[in-house]
Swiss-Prot record:
Binding site for NAD(+): 2-30, 65-66, 96, 246
Catalytic activity: 3-hydroxy-2-methylpropanoate + NAD(+) = 2-methyl-3-oxopropanoate + NADH + H(+)
Gene it is expressed from: mmsB
Catalytic class of the enzyme: oxidoreductase
Protein name: 3-hydroxyisobutyrate dehydrogenase
Keywords, ordered alphabetically: Branched-chain amino acid catabolism, NAD, Oxidoreductase
Active site residues according to the UniProt entry: K171
Domain of life: Bacteria
GO biological process, one term: valine catabolic process
Pathway(s) served: Amino-acid degradation; L-valine degradation
Length: 298
């Protein structure tokens, strides 16, 4: 049993904290939304009135926040956790942020004698609820070894990608490829249907041929082809368009910083941005709704 502080109880953080409780850990929780805290308290967590109070007595601190500026605000500055937290807890940030930001915060932690790992996740809300997330960890090997037993209570695949920031780099590479694959799959399906093909038949042909990919196997973007996919449920739930746009933006910013050529990543970002701008509701839909961009008005 480990004393854990969990900061950020949104769509991902809430279920992750719940799985730590199910595993028998003592979990203190904090979120800016009192309702989110109450939901975890009802499951056995101890609620806190501030991030600092949440971390009192913690052996491990886990944060899951929307963006880099929130991570910097939590950890850095005179009022940040690095300046005020007691003891030597292991710090694990599961937010998806720029690699440069992850390194900046980790270096500040090291200056205080603390270890902060970047550990972004893959698997979406469904994976968070089921405890089957993939964690992609950046940081020293000894920190990874300490974190692994805790992360295994929330995930199925735990990867050590390398030093500080490596987890974030691997995550944005994966999601850039995911965006490219989904856009390409939607484009191919739309072309086939315009020529009179049955999307289910075309999907099966491509699945069993050299065009086979994750989207065709598990997450078909055409409505009605795969009953359990978001596409067959009004594109509700899953990985939202706004989050795909955020991650593609992080990938392109990093590519510019390291002078890497990512023309397909840039095109995917443009396509998802165009999709988001087409209708105010699109940002909240699952990213496979990019199919709508290709279908037009049918």
């Amino acid at each position: 049993m480990t004393d854990i502080a969990f900061l950020g109880l949104g769509n991902m953080g809430g279920p992750m904290a719940a799985n730590l409780l199910k595993a028998g850990h003592r979990v203190n929780v904090f979120d800016l939304q009192p309702k989110a805290v109450l939901g975890l308290v009802e499951q056995g967590a101890q609620g806190a009135d501030s991030a600092l109070q949440c971390c009192e007595g913690a052996e491990v601190v886990i944060s899951m926040l929307p963006a880099g500026q929130h991570v910097e605000s939590l950890y850095l500055g005179d009022d940040g956790l690095l300046a005020r937290v007691a003891g030597k807890p292991l710090l694990i940030d599961c937010s998806t942020i720029a690699p440069e930001t992850a390194r900046k915060v980790a270096e500040a932690a090291a200056a205080k004698g603390l270890t902060l790992l970047d550990a972004p996740v893959s698997g979406g809300v469904g994976g968070a609820r089921a405890g089957t997330l993939s964690f992609i960890v950046g940081g020293p090997a000894e920190g990874f070894a300490r974190a692994r037993p805790v992360l295994e209570n929330m995930g199925r695949n735990i990867f050590h990608a390398g030093d500080h920031g490596a987890g974030q780099v691997a995550k944005i590479c994966n999601n850039m490829l995911l965006g490219i694959l989904m856009a390409g799959t939607a484009e191919a399906l739309a072309l086939g249907v315009k020529n009179g093909l049955d999307p289910a038949v075309l999907s099966e042909v491509m699945k069993q041929s050299s065009g086979g990919n994750w989207a065709l196997n598990l997450y078909n973007p055409w409505p009605g082809v795969m009953p359990q996919a978001p596409a067959s449920n009004g594109y509700a739930g899953g990985f939202q368009v706004r989050l795909m746009n955020k991650d593609l933006g992080l990938a392109l910013a990093n590519a510019q910083a390291v002078q890497a050529s990512t023309p397909l990543g840039a095109l995917a970002r443009n396509l998802f941005s165009l999709h988001a701008q087409a209708d105010a509701e699109h940002e909240g839909l699952d990213f496979s709704s990019i199919q709508k961009l290709y279908r037009g008005k049918d």
